[in-house]
């Protein structure tokens, strides 16, 4: 009598495929039809982090992808859950973070005829505009190759978000186990090196050598590349001033003598040759137009050829992955050495010192209530002594001021709203950074920004993650002193509840909460929160009149020209 065949099903196959591709964590929200998939993943040793909202789970997966160069995995239920995660998927794609969102879905035969199935939605086609790629698996024997394609697409070339649709009938479909295991694909070399053209590298070095006022701009693509040593060696060898975009802070420490961050506007307006390294000439750099010299020449190191000439003509495009491009640039520099003119560095240093003095006066002024500057000065003091901290930052004024005030000392330690300027990334990024690194995380949040994902503090407490959340509470969106123009006694459109005690939320989840009104209280609470490694909220009471509308990008917010 022959032995009975062992059977398996779709959800077991996809979990085994994840394991064989070294995926060790899933972020998600369970429900129909993926609950048992999450249970089985956990049973097989994959860490499952359950969230209160799919958007935050997706943000955590994206943060993990940025930090590890491996796709972060987000698991959602069908239709509404899928749509909740879609913002995070789009955000990953826009920012160039590798992420795979896996969603269960309803019966294709019913959905395609629009016959009213449970949570009916054509999810794959809904995802396509917002993802680097979107795939649907219609038969269980394709689960292995589908995941392999998703992994490769998410990390190769410019990284991004990939959507993988798993209908319920495919997850439940049974197959003979040994045969099913042969369909699993282990992805080899998922992100092959893309070498730049040697002539482009030579031209780039030649142009930099002729420059009188060169500048290097480091973007988050440079941070993602993990080319920290090559970038440092190149910058220090040629003595070229550099300007880090916000998530590139720390590739070289912000206190480095060649950092031009404190003279940003002057450097951008006066540089004659600018080398963009994993940075795009988008709105964050005024598209290379307003505030820039008309005759600036650009060198652009980017993995995506379509990014070249997007806003300004690029004199020397160097297309390839950043690590390979920087290796080539270093080799060429050693053959054709040069040093940036001292006069340019000296002029930048004068402007840096002048601006630093102005900032010092703001930071050292004691006020009651606190404002952004003296409160962030206290935070800076503590983080200077805790340089391994991962810093998550979102808000308007809270983001803009923290970016300028708080120095970073190590690469990939700062996560923020990024290219899209998305509010709500805070708790998801904090959880993703903590789970991925095992290190303490400090999330500096505006009170409005915190509200987008605040319920994830339960997730933080449930997993006992070492996350300290510092909420700058001025009782409003931008500011808390809005005026009711209706005269009806209603809150202003920009007002939140004044005197809210966000620290009290921690009482519900057995975390730790502090309410602080002075810089000394803030220093003590933040130091204690970090050292304790306990989930902590610090409610920082600041002046409702502190801040400006839309932070540092007021010009992007149109004003009415008629009426009130």
Residue ranges of each PLM-predicted region?
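Phosphate/pyrophosphate-binding active-site segments
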Residues: 2-5, 141, 295-395, 519-528, ...
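Active-site diphosphate/adenylate-binding microenvironment
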Residues: 11-15, 22, 29-32, 37-39, ...
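Thiamine diphosphate
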Residues: 110-121, 265-268, 292, 309-311, ...
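A structural motif corresponding to the C-terminal end of an alpha-helix
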Residues: 130, 378-387, 506-512
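Generic enzyme active-site microenvironment
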Residues: 163, 300, 392, 444-445
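Conserved short loop/turn motifs at secondary-structure junctions
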Residues: 219-224, 364-365, 446-448
